[in-house]
Curated annotation (Swiss-Prot):
Coiled coil: none annotated. Pfam families: PetG (PF02529). The lineage of its organism: Eukaryota, Viridiplantae, Chlorophyta, core chlorophytes, Chlorophyceae. The chain crosses the membrane at residues 5-25. It is found in: Plastid, Chloroplast thylakoid membrane. Belongs to the PetG family. This is Cytochrome b6-f complex subunit 5.
């Protein structure tokens, strides 16, 4: 049961992480490299 819960958490987190990376890269590409120090 723990493995199923862990795999569900991983399968839920991986697309969100990839989507977040794409969104941040897209926003930095749109605005130029002015906002690289905002994190």
């Amino acid at each position: 049961m723990v493995e199923a819960l862990l795999s569900g958490i991983v399968l839920g987190l991986v697309p969100v992480t990839i989507l977040g990376l794409f969104v941040t890269a897209y926003l930095q590409y749109r605005r130029g490299d002015r906002v690289t120090s905002s994190f």
